[in-house]
């Protein structure tokens, strides 16, 4: 009788080993680095890293930045539509060595995520961190702290690898500049030839999709006889150019309505719309994005919030499987104490989870672990 015997990995060809490893989730692969020199060499190869990101089954971790801390969350939405209360548990806290305040926690005003990398920025610090591999890259900046900065992280998409870059908006009230930081050369350069025909509000959070960054921007235009001043625009890190203005799936004004942008697993975009003097909230999702152009939208959710109203600055992510969305914002109570509140919303369902202490200025996002090197 014939028996099947397992073959040791050492007798497999390198191509076959690479093909097997390219299908293993990133969080599992990092634990294999020290087990075999051949595997470690493969895992450090930029060509393999790109292949792995394109091939392996993605892991999605819900993250929360609050009170200078970054924590992973366990969000259970099953049963939301059957009147079963959902649950949220703050799990492992991620600490980045060196990026510490006096309390020993991660200090950051904003976090931007792209392909498993987290970009932390405040008035004095720029650091990129891959929590999966533990790698960090501290970036020097000579810009004065008095200038207003806005950052985005993306990559130049080449055939064999991806070259990562940071885009920085600098505005001191009189002068406006764009700068690019290239990871390969560890240097900044000014983008003199790029024209800006919009205003980027301080509260507009950029979102990364397939290496490019998208924002909701302000630019007064007349559409069908009505004044509309909110559009979607993008920055292509390969061409280093802004894309055309794309109309949102609703007519709105940045100055009065609540609008917030999010990414759906870094593959598509979603946008929240809460019209002034209305208790109805809508979330729309892009159907397709080709060459940085959003071609169409679908309405994902429409909910009557009854007495609640969101404010600009709210962050959120959606759960397509459970037809739900999770939001976070700071809310004062009757004693003017600030609480960080998480809202879980489904079709005709609203659940509230109070994280109690604050203020946090919480920022929610979905993180995709990767082997990307910095």
From Swiss-Prot:
SUPFAM superfamilies: F-box domain
Pfam families reported for this sequence: F-box, FBA_1
F-box domain sequence ranges: 6-52
Gene3D superfamilies: 1.20.1280.50
Entry-linked PANTHER family: BNACNNG10540D PROTEIN (PTHR31672), F-BOX PROTEIN CPR30-LIKE (PTHR31672:SF13)
Name of the protein in its database record: Putative F-box protein At3g17480
């Amino acid at each position: 009788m014939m028996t099947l015997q397992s073959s040791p990995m050492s007798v497999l060809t390198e191509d076959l080993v690479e093909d097997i490893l390219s299908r293993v989730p990133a969080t599992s692969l990092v634990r294999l680095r020290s087990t075999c020199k051949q595997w470690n060499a493969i895992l450090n190869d930029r060509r393999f890293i790109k292949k792995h990101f394109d091939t392996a089954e993605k892991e999605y971790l819900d993250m929360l930045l609050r009170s200078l801390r970054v924590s992973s969350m366990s969000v259970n939405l099953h049963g939301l539509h059957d009147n079963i209360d959902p649950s949220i548990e703050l799990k492992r806290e991620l600490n980045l060595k060196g990026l510490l305040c006096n309390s020993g926690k991660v200090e950051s005003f904003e976090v931007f995520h792209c392909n498993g990398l987290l970009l932390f920025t405040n008035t004095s610090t720029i650091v990129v961190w891959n929590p999966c591999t533990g790698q960090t890259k501290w970036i020097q900046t000579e810009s004065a702290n008095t200038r207003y900065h806005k950052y985005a992280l993306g990559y130049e998409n080449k055939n064999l690898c991806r070259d990562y870059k940071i885009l920085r908006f600098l505005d001191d009230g009189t002068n406006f500049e764009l700068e690019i930081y290239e990871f390969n050369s560890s240097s900044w350069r000014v983008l003199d030839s790029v024209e800006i025909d919009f205003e980027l509000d301080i509260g507009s959070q950029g979102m990364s999709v397939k290496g490019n960054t998208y924002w909701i921007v302000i630019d007064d235009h007349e559409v069908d006889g009505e004044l509309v001043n909110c559009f979607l625009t993008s920055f292509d890190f390969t061409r280093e150019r802004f894309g055309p203005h794309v109309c949102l799936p609703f007519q709105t004004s940045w100055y009065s309505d609540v609008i917030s942008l999010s990414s759906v697993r870094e593959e598509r975009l979603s946008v929240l719309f809460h019209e002034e003097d209305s208790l109805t909230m809508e979330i729309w999702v892009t159907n397709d994005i080709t060459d940085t152009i959003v071609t169409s939208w679908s309405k994902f959710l429409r909910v009557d919030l009854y007495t609640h109203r969101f404010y600009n600055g709210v962050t959120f992510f959606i759960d397509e499987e459970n037809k739900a969305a999770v939001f976070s914002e700071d809310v004062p109570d009757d004693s003017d104490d600030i609480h960080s509140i998480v809202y879980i919303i489904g079709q005709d369902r609203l659940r509230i989870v109070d994280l109690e202490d604050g203020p946090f200025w919480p920022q929610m996002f979905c993180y995709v672990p990767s082997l990307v090197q910095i």
